[in-house]
Structures are given as structure tokens and as C-alpha cells.
């Protein structure tokens, strides 16, 4: 929900469409790609489970920086820092997630297995995006960002407790 509501927040605080396009479409997207590269270099030495926990924790922390503009800290350097931190860590977390999804795919039907896993993740993202505006209308930007952070933290705790490294091709 948080990433979906960040763009409307930027509109509401008065950024121009050009500023938003540059911030999210160019700079933050480059940060996302760099996050994927960094994660790709770190997954083997850290292992899959540790990578997913560390990168998801970093994403949770960076997501909470969305609260800065929600509380009125809206100067451009802060907005760039917030967007870049969030997109960098999303790139890291996504790379770890996709690596594990590939590990969990069987040799008999890897394309189908990966596609099903990816589709479930995409449907979850679409569902969260679909309700984010309604939730924001009810509890505001601050509430959405805090709730998203709480959900992300719970997810990290579940990953740490439930993730089974024995069933992955690499730990």
C-alpha cells in the first residue's frame, strides 16, 4: 500500500508532474536497478534466507521514511532520499525473492512453477494497490505508511521463523 500512496502524496504536497516523473521515473528507477545489482552480488555470500530477511528489513525501514513527507518534511533532497532508499531496497528485496522463487521451482516444470509464484505475488500487489486509496481515505497517508510498515515487519518476522532453508537449492 505504501508505494502506491507515495505518488499521490507527492501530488498533494505540490510537486509538479515533471518533478514526480523525474524523481520516480528516472532517479528512483535507477536506484531500484542498483538495488538489484547489489543484491545479486550479496545473495551468494549471505545466503538466501539471510538475504531475504536483511533486504526485507531494510525495505521495512526505508518504507517508514515515507512518513517524513507525510509529516511535512517536503524539501526535494529529502524526497529524493526517501524515494531512492525505498526503491533501492525494493530492488534488493525483489531480487532475493525472485532468486528463492527460482530455487523453489521444480526441474520438471520450472517455467510454470515460477509463473504461478510470480502471479500470486503480482495479485497480492494489485490487491494492496486496489485498497490503498480506500485505506488512505480512512486513516490518511500517515496511517497507511504506519500500517504498511507494521505489515512489513510482521512479514519479516514470519520469514525469519518459517522460511525453510533445507528446501532451497542454496541457503
What are these regions (language model features)?
Residues 17-18, 107-117:
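Loop-to-transmembrane helix entry/capping segments in MFS-fold secondary transporters
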Residues 147-171:
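Multi-pass alpha-helical transporter architecture, strongest
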Residues 91-106:
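Intracellular juxtamembrane helix-capping segments at the cytosolic ends
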Residues 76-93:
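Hydrophobic core of transmembrane alpha-helices in multi-pass small-molecule transporters
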Residues 4-21:
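Short amphipathic helix-loop junctions that connect adjacent transmembrane helices
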Residues 57-74:
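C-terminal ends and interior cores of transmembrane alpha-helices
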Amino acid at each position: 500500500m505504501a508505494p502506491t500512496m507515495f505518488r499521490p502524496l507527492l501530488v498533494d504536497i505540490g510537486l509538479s508532474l515533471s518533478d514526480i516523473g523525474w524523481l520516480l521515473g528516472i532517479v528512483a528507477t535507477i536506484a531500484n536497478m542498483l538495488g538489484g545489482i547489489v543484491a545479486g552480488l550479496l545473495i551468494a555470500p549471505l545466503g538466501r534466507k539471510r538475504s531475504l530477511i536483511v533486504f526485507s528489513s531494510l525495505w521495512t525501514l526505508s518504507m517508514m521514511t515515507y512518513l517524513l513527507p507525510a509529516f511535512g518534511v517536503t524539501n526535494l533532497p529529502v524526497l529524493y532520499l526517501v524515494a531512492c532508499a525505498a526503491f533501492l531496497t525494493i530492488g534488493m528485496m525483489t531480487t532475493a525473492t525472485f532468486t528463492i522463487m527460482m530455487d523453489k521451482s521444480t526441474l520438471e516444470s520450472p517455467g510454470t512453477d515460477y509463473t504461478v509464484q510470480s502471479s500470486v505475488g503480482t495479485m497480492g500487489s494489485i490487491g494492496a494497490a486496489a485498497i490503498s486509496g480506500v485505506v488512505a481515505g480512512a486513516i490518511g497517508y500517515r496511517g497507511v505508511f504506519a500500517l504498511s510498515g507494521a505489515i512489513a515487519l510482521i512479514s519479516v518476522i514470519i520469514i525469519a521463523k518459517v522460511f525453510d532453508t533445507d528446501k532451497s537449492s542454496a541457503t
